[in-house]
Curated annotation (Swiss-Prot):
Binds 1 Mg(2+) ion per subunit. The magnesium is bound as Mg-PRPP. One of its GO terms (biological process) is UMP salvage. This is Uracil phosphoribosyltransferase. Uracil binds at I193, G198, D199, A200.
Length: 208
């Protein structure tokens, strides 16, 4: 599995702001979108292009466009919605697939409860977004669902990742590319990332 920790100064600055204990819902939500946008830029740099002819202002001209079907964005509910618009800023025609998974607070195991994938996901690049990769359970379950639907091109965008989650994800799906702003230190006894961002879902939706 290829893991890219994006060290761009803008991303590192913004992640630092998100770690503040008293950050407002508005600010946290804004930065989650911004970092999602910046990670998308990095994660799509190797998309295949093709030459097409269009009608320009003074006649026919050859231009470069992304080849084949465009991507589908796959936010993991609910926190993944906070990064979705950042992806769509760069790929506004991308289709949206949704997967709902919550983590059982006692067992820390993922519990799927909803999925709605685009019908031709097997022809698209799936960009899976979730702010936190902690134990990796929710992400693994999501990738399982996407692959079962026939998708073979998958990249993962997370704001912060724990080493334990990355290890588990690699064991389950070694063919992935993962882009993150930070690989943090460890998980605590409750399965939260340290230093982490706190509960990203609560902070994005104002339910903290």
């Amino acid at each position: 599995m290829k893991v890219i920790e994006v060290k761009h100064p803008l991303i590192q600055h913004k992640i630092g702001l998100m770690r503040e204990a008293d950050i407002s819902t508005k600010r946290f939500r804004e930065i989650a979108r911004e970092v999602g946008s910046l990670l998308t830029y990095e994660a799509t740099k190797n998309l295949e292009l093709e030459t097409v002819k269009i009608q320009g202002w003074n006649g026919e001209v050859e231009v470069q466009q992304i080849k084949g079907k465009k991507a589908t964005v796959v936010p993991i509910l609910r926190a993944g919605l906070g990064m979705m618009d950042g992806v769509l800023e760069h790929m506004p025609s991308a289709k949206i697939s949704v997967v709902g998974i919550y983590r059982d607070e006692k067992t820390l195991e993922p519990v799927p409860y909803f999925q709605k994938l685009v019908s031709n996901i097997d022809e698209r690049l799936a960009i899976v977004v979730d702010p936190m990769l902690a134990t990796g359970g929710s992400m693994i379950s999501t990738i399982d669902l996407i692959k079962k639907a026939g998708c073979t091109r998958i990249v993962v965008l997370v704001l912060v990742a724990a080493p334990e989650g990355l290890k588990a994800l690699e064991a389950a799906h070694p063919d992935l590319e993962v882009y993150t702003a930070s690989i943090d230190d460890h998980l605590d006894e409750q399965g939260y990332i340290v230093p982490g961002l706190g509960d990203a879902g609560d902070k994005i939706f104002g339910t903290k």
